[in-house]
């Protein structure tokens, strides 16, 4: 077998850890909005607010996590520490059923763990390849698709355990999954000796009376407590504003650090891709909030007398990602000709177009509910599957481009900024969108019909919004195609 055509052996341990991280994160996420509304009896407004705050802050911390990995911990140690914290957070969340005061603390611990894990798992994968290695795009697609095995199994397993036993057991299962992934990853340590490790010189250096490892321990204790206060006082939006401002300052600093026109061009491409990713995920993240409650209330979930738990529907788009991702990874590996920038914009246009198509199907489903009281399950499954397929043309493409940039020591921070915009801000926008479906704004006389009409309106607006994004991206694609062909003709002449 051609060694250049096969993936590095270390990728399989990264993929295994990603699978279990997806299991842990998405198992908990599938339960959270339902836990808030059905168990803790939050109204829709309050539940959407806390859910979007959690999903926003979970993407703010990767900036700090990326910085710590770049300067002190290295990607491998940051990933392991993040996985451990997430497991602890899920266990504490299970206790919040008995003591609701643990709710904010548990979410804060998960947020901190996710910050260390999420941006650095992609950077760790990037360390396995040379910058121009043609296997790189295929590796990222494989990571993204295989990781979704966890996303498929988690809502089914955690949803079933919650339904049959308790909410606490459902969250505990998510924690067990994360610990299992960490153990598997540790078994493959020998394959990562060439990756960047802990910077012991920086870690042991003294700053303001304490060595840096002492400040790191203080940070690991103080950060969850601070984030707990943000949840409790509902101040997360202010943290988001501050984080965004810091991210923009850091981005400007990186731009000044770029020494060549090629580096600045690559950085500009990353920024533009990030903005479109932000809009894409503002639409896609309805899956964990408004779409989940829509399914719970207005979709017929009965199969031969068995009512399918709402959480299990979170598996549908993940299954679509896994099913189509392997094929896409093969196509990317084989199709390496042509201009890379043109291919990138073509993929983004396809991803946004599929998202628009998915919400068009959900709009039809909501209209069916408005007319007949409940919508059919197959129509809902089809819409979620199309939306899942769309994801393959957004994140893997953008992350591959970020790890490709030829500016030393910035990939972790750039990944964190990408997570901030396409994750934190996108989730905040998703919360604003989802709040338009909240029942608390409806009067009692026509609550049910009015609620369904709100879902129809929101899903339809997202359909047109995503389609408008497709139009803009296609214009960029046409411009890049024309420029590439003009250069090719100039070279031939």
Curated annotation (Swiss-Prot):
GO terms for cellular component: plasma membrane. CDD domains: MFS_DtpA_like. The chain crosses the membrane at residues 14-34, 49-69, 91-111, 138-158, 167-187, 212-232, 235-255, 267-287, 312-332, 344-364, 379-399, 413-433, 458-478. It is found in: Cell inner membrane. Keywords: Cell inner membrane, Cell membrane, Membrane, Peptide transport, Protein transport, Transmembrane, Transmembrane helix, Transport. It is a multi-pass membrane protein. Its main location: membrane. GO terms for molecular function: dipeptide transmembrane transporter activity; peptide:proton symporter activity; tripeptide transmembrane transporter activity. One of its GO terms (biological process) is protein transport. The keyword Transferase does not apply. InterPro entries: AA/pep_transptr_DtpD, Dipep/tripep_permease, MFS_dom, MFS_trans_sf, MFS_Transporters, POT_fam, PTR2_symporter_CS. PROSITE patterns: MFS (PS50850), PTR2_1 (PS01022), PTR2_2 (PS01023). Probable proton-dependent permease that transports dipeptides. HAMAP family: PTR2_DtpD_subfam (MF_01880). Belongs to the major facilitator superfamily. Proton-dependent oligopeptide transporter (POT/PTR) (TC 2.A.17) family. DtpD subfamily. This is Dipeptide permease D. It comes from Salmonella typhimurium (strain LT2 / SGSC1412 / ATCC 700720). The gene is dtpD.
